[in-house]
Design a protein with these regions (language model features):
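Short alpha-helices
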Residues: 1-12
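Short hydrophobic beta-strand motif reused across regulatory alpha/beta modules
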Residues: 79-82, 131, 136, 143-148
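Terminal peptide-recognition signature
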Residues: 2, 37, 60, 75, ...
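Bateman (tandem CBS) regulatory domains
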Residues: 30-44, 98-109
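A cytosolic small-molecule/anion-sensing beta-strand core signal
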Residues: 72-73, 82, 105, 137
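A short, polar/charged loop-to-alpha-helix boundary motif
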Residues: 85-99, 149-155
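The conserved cystathionine-beta-synthase
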Residues: 46-64, 71, 90, 111-130, ...
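Cyclic nucleotide-binding regulatory module and flanking cytosolic helices
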Residues: 13-38
């Protein structure tokens, strides 16, 4: 009771506690950003729009995130493909292995900026029932966040 009274008197907020204890759950929740938890650089799985389905599967398997992004002939990110997209495409087509990435990618994907709090990213993924988020800076893909990675951090 004395500690709470003192905290109230000094206007001590959760953010102040987080700064003093950045490794704790509250600290991580209030301080870690998308930039801190994202996979970036060569670790981001990317395929060209005209790559065959087998190449898409290979890329997703090699990177182990469960998703790959799709870029067009101008190297602009135009979509993403998840494990689920692959399963749905196989279920709908007898010619899946003749398909290219653009045939079964999701053009509308959810993204966040690199400064978005990791806890907010986790909330977005839970609300939208998705396992990953693109991290975009303008039109540039700078990273990808996997829900499992955030949960492992204790956020």
């Amino acid at each position: 009771a004395l500690a709470i009274s003192l905290m109230n008197k000094k206007d001590f907020k959760p953010e102040d506690f987080a700064k003093s204890h950045p490794g704790g759950t509250l600290g991580k929740r209030l301080l870690l950003s998308a930039n801190d938890v994202m996979v970036s650089g060569n670790e981001i799985p990317i395929v060209k729009y005209d790559q065959l389905a087998k190449d898409v599967i290979k890329t997703i398997s090699e990177k182990g995130i469960g998703v790959t992004f799709v870029k067009d002939q101008n190297d602009k990110i135009v979509g993403l493909i998840t494990d689920g997209d692959i399963r749905r495409a196989i279920d709908k087509s007898n010619y899946f292995f003749d398909m290219t990435a653009q045939d079964f990618m999701s053009a509308n994907f959810i993204s966040v900026g690199p400064d978005e709090l990791a806890s907010a990213c986790l909330e977005i993924m839970a609300t939208k029932k998705i396992g990953c988020l693109a991290v975009m800076q303008g039109d540039d893909l700078v990273g990808v966040i996997n829900q499992k990675d955030i949960v492992k951090l204790g956020i």
